[in-house]
């Protein structure tokens, strides 16, 4: 007696994608806004504005239909957290993917002009962290409203253009700009038209590391200058103030153009209260190194400076006791 095998005992046919174990698409939707992940080399990267949380997002997660995945995307709510997904093919081959979230800056294209406190408040409400143009603070109009507080600008990380301080700004310092790491330049007055910000005593941006253009500060009220983390200036550094008491650039290594500091008073006499100037890490000034008319200067030190375009100490004050440039070996023009 011969019996044929039942169809129920036959081995089922493998699906066409039995060897596949891929994640092909991840899309997350928050508040009607969809974000599509980039999948490269088994890394799933989804980029969202820093203000957006992906927790409890609506998720569309596509992977090989015959495969299994752990953990199950449907069981996850905390999508802000990095994790690993394992996709196992129908035939048992595992493939791991790393899921990552990048919280990106919010950028504004163009110039930002903040003339009033209301302007500052309205700008902060946009959550912008990177300005791709100039940041203009205050106004030069005769009837301009005074602006005294820019602390709310602490969310800013970068200004690709210039930061320009105009005369209606009456703050004592630049508190609010301390989290900016890179700028195109800083302008407070010019060499031919000094700024008249009567209360501005301190110019400081504590997180600033790089300037692609110039620092120009021409204001006789400025007494304190402090840039704790600034390393490179791709343009000029120009300071004109008759009230200078301290000048701190502890990490500055390179000035691509001129380094020019003067403290002439309004009647043309040497000024400033500063007695010691030391730029400890500066190694190169491509242009002119000029320090002049600091009336009470006793010690002037550039301990690591190796190369300059030229040196201009034409108006060295009579009290000067120490002038130290021990490593200077290259002067491309005049000494």
Model-inferred region functions:
Residues 2-4:
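C-terminal motif of bacterial Sec signal peptides marking the signal peptidase cleavage site
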Residues 6-124, 129-133, 158-161, 176-182:
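Beta-rich interaction/scaffold domains
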Residues 107-119, 131-152, 158-335:
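Concave beta-strand-loop units of leucine-rich repeat
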